[in-house]
Amino acid sequence: MADSEQQEDYKIQGFDADTQSLLKTALKEPGSVDLEKAASVIVDQSLRDATFSREAGRMCYTIIQAESKQTGRTVFRSTLLNRLQVEYKNRKETRARSLQEWVCYVGFMCNVFDYLRVNNMPMLALVNPVYDCLFDLVQPDNLKREEEVDCLVLQLHRVGEQLEKMNCQRMDELFSQLRDSFLLQGGLSSLTQLLLLEMIEYRAAGWRMTDAAQKYYYSEVSE
């Protein structure tokens, strides 16, 4: 537990002292701080900082669990989900304005989906929004941007298997589109083609990568 707290402390070092205090208290005594503000701070930072967005889901999960246990309320979770919904509705404008913010948003959404559970199951309310973001990433124009391809691959490695269990049909549709792009779309970089092929084979192998495949793709990407 001490290691976990140190990791969380480490993730919030970029905040000012007051915000660090707010988040540290929210993690341990959520009933004594403004959880709506804490949720907004975490989302805002996640949209700016890719490293933070990849880890913030764990912090959200910790606060949600602590609030439920100590107060029986869901203020933080409700605020977080409402904010994610707003950002989801504005995602096309976000992408047009800032590619980095858009990629951070997708990473954060998938991270929250990965960590948040209801009765030991992923949150149903997040399944289709996460899928919609992944479908956005496999659009022809998006596949020409390395940042979006990297994001797509990272998120499918993170939550692809869980998503497929929640809605197999949409995953079939996503990979049908991904295969078509790999086979038919011109103008893709050799790295993008390699990453798309890796994802196709990764899913075909039951969301597992063989040692041989890992060595092959790793050596190709690093060259």
Swiss-Prot record:
Residue span(s) of domain MIF4G: 9-206
One annotated GO biological process: regulation of translation
Subcellular location: Cytoplasm; Nucleus
Annotated keywords: Cytoplasm, Nucleus, Translation regulation
Coiled coil: none
GO molecular function, one term: RNA binding
Cellular-component GO terms for this entry: cytoplasm; nucleus
Cited function: Functions in replication-dependent translation of histone mRNAs which differ from other eukaryotic mRNAs in that they do not end with a poly-A tail but a stem-loop. May participate in circularizing those mRNAs specifically enhancing their translation.
Family of the protein in this entry: Belongs to the MIF4GD family.
Subunit structure, as described in the record: Interacts with eif4g1, eif4g2 and slbp; probably tethered by SLBP to the 3'-end of mRNAs ending with the histone stem-loop, it also interacts with eif4g1 which is bound to their 5'-end.
Database matches in PANTHER family: EIF4G DOMAIN PROTEIN, MIF4G DOMAIN-CONTAINING PROTEIN
Name by which UniProt lists this protein: MIF4G domain-containing protein
Organism: Xenopus tropicalis (Western clawed frog)
Lineage: Eukaryota, Metazoa, Chordata, Craniata, Vertebrata
Gene: mif4gd
